[in-house]
Amino acid sequence: MLFTGTLLFLSCQYSGPVEEALRQSGRNRSELERVLDFYREKGDDLSLQAAKFLISEMPGHHSLENSSLSEFRQALDTMYPQMSNVIKRVVYQVPYRKDEFVANAEKRYDLETLSADYLIAHIDNIVEMWRKCSWLKDYSFEEFCEYLLPYRFAREPLLTRFDSTTYWWQEIKARTEYYKHLPPSPMELRHFLHGIIDRQDDPYMQDFELPMSKGKHTFDCLDKCYYNLSTLRSAGIPCAIDYVPAWPTRNGTHYWWVLIDPLCMHNTYSDTQNPRAAKVLRQTYSHHPVPRPGKNEYIPEQFLNPFNKDVTAEYVKVSDVKLSFPLFRQRHAYLAVFNEMSWKPVAWAKIRGGRALFKEMGRSVVYLPVCYKKEQLCSAGNPILLKSDGSTVELNPKSERFSLTLTRKYPLTYSKTQWSRNMLDCRFEAGDDSTFRDSTVVFHISRPDPNLNYVEVFVPDSIGAFRCWRIIGPKRIWLGELAFYSKEGEKLSGRTIYHPEDKGETPENAFDNDELTYTNVYAWLGKDFERPEKVSKIRYISRTDANGIIRGMEYGLMYFDRQWFSAGRQTAVADSLVFDSLPAGALFWLRNLTEGREERIFTYDSEFDRIVYW
């Protein structure tokens, strides 16, 4: 009898990850075991393997709960009773970004709360999809588990009541069977899905009212990713969310959704691509390695999230980077990129024998090796440049000195150069009245300003006094500021005038002393001074990002030598700054100490006499 009981006990044991998950589930273990027993007794091995995958990877997955979040969801359901589940999964998470909602929120772990009935209903639906949808036959079981099977994609509250969106895959299947000669690629299937959804969810994506007087909300890139993931997987289209935790060449982060196609590496919108990324991560249901802290070692929270897969190599050329960390006793080191005017770690590695190997780092990026002392980020040397060919160069300041003229603190993009190019062929005219019937041409703009900065036009003495002055062009004029000055240097004031057919383009923005506000006026814009005025100077700026050198503002140039050092401070008296005695080979950072938040690190290329932003 004892022998028989031992056999029964052993038959209930599972492989390591499944058993560990069951152990962590506490009182909910019986619910999860009921799922496994259901498929074992049914003899459905595919569904059993799917259940084992979901349970083994379930540790750590959770939603957030407190009275405020519950009240928000109830109010949302009352306000929008027709809202589909795919939208609810997204909007239910909007309060997660507000401190007043999540300050005392409790993590509700799936292992401890999911019912057997919910999991069985979910697995039955997705496995039926897998078996019946012809377009899924080329996907591996591993891809099916990762990109279709999961019941959640983030920390959203789980919806136990299924709606019609749960079975969209059946409608997609019917359409592919009707159009038998259409190869069902993921992108083609997505077009079918658009036909099913139509525009029914559009009202919830832009400027829609939230309950509990929380204002209006417009979907950002992460919301749109969640929505697309929710809709695509409901339609039987494997997909995932990829993201850049911190851009290495500009501020911010970015999320986008990606179709998983077994016949090509990835299939995304072109505007989500960037030629330089340090790390690209994919949000997953399954676990991936995370650093294990040593005694009293601080690990940033972002690296403790096990649901991230490194997919950098699917987007950019990568190289491994091996660096020395001889002075640090921590277990882990990091590589950081410059983002939002600070160094932000994007990769980690274990220190072994005083060295750390960082795998698959994006090329053409400047990295700073760093470690943490308690929670303080500390540089572990000077920045390195991982070049496009995979080699590395340490950016060490040298004893050799040079001078540098600076006209901007942030790189241009092609689209921004169009702002100043739009000013080409515009001209300034003066006339006796606002009809400009017998106008006098004062100046013709023949070249764009390369720095998107102010341009001064000195009016010849031969030009007399006129009541009305304007800028006129062959098309719309993108203008940030426009001012007319007297011989004494005083700014002249008058009534704003513009083309009579121009409406709603806020022409006043060109005269509000703020170059970041702009107007896109039709044909022409100017001033009526009510009496003839002798103008000696015209000062204008196209639409701009205000990252040029602006007179009157204070700037500081920094260089890095294991930390930031000042190379000098100046108040701008012209549209450029000159700094002398700068160390060659260093990494620099020009700061606007008066205002602004867009600033980039750079090096100086003496061979081509140019600044290279990173």
Predicted regions, residues:
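Edge beta-strands of extracellular beta-sandwich domains
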Residues: 375-396, 480-481, 597-607
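A short, amphipathic beta-strand motif
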Residues: 317-327, 406-410, 414
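Short, acidic Ser/Thr/Gly-rich low-complexity loop/linker segments typical of extracellular
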Residues: 342-354, 568-572
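Extracellular beta-sheet/turn segments enriched in Thr/Pro/Gly and aliphatic residues
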Residues: 304-312, 382-408, 608-614
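Disordered, acidic Ser/Thr/Pro-rich linker "stalks" and the adjacent N-terminal cap
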Residues: 401-465, 476-550, 555, 596-614
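Short Pro-Gly-centered beta-turn/loop motif in secreted/extracellular proteins
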Residues: 356-368, 372-375, 463, 580-585
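Hydrophobic/aromatic-rich core segments of domains that either
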Residues: 17-26, 40-42, 175-192, 201-211, ...
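Secondary-structure boundary elements
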Residues: 33-34, 42-216, 252
